[in-house]
UniProtKB/Swiss-Prot annotation:
It comes from Pelargonium hortorum. This is Small ribosomal subunit protein uS12cz/uS12cy/uS12cx/uS12w. InterPro entries: NA-bd_OB-fold, Ribosomal_uS12, Ribosomal_uS12_bac. The keyword Ribonucleoprotein applies. GO terms for molecular function: rRNA binding; structural constituent of ribosome. Keywords: Chloroplast, Plastid, Ribonucleoprotein, Ribosomal protein, RNA-binding, rRNA-binding. The keyword Kinase does not apply. Belongs to the universal ribosomal protein uS12 family. The gene is rps12-A. The lineage of its organism: Eukaryota, Viridiplantae, Streptophyta, Embryophyta, Tracheophyta. Residues 1-13 have a biased composition (Polar residues). Residues 1-30 are annotated as: Disordered.
Amino acid sequence: MPTSNQLLRNSRQPVRKTKKTPALRGCPQRRGRCSKVYIINPKKPNSGNRKVARVRLTSGFEITAYIPGVGHNVQEHSVVLVRGGRVKDLPGVRYHIVRGTLDAAGVKDRKQGRSKYGVKKPK
């Protein structure tokens, strides 16, 4: 607990909020180029193979982004759109690749929840 003299000398600093997506620099999405596409395993109670990509963004940051959905066509040198949003069971993965834009195609044969996976309405 500071004394009144200490508070007079220098006032209390407000608590600064940490940004959840610093690499996007305040933008809703950012474009980037994939430098590596690979598989990682999730944290303890979960298991499986999660597809992720290392992406160099136009803001200069190099980030790890999750590739959602079943199957993908993302490979090295693909240009992708990245949005914020972490993956709870993958430490260090705080971004998602947007499916159905640029080089990331939509999920094949998807009928429900299509808007999240970049799939047009079937005829």
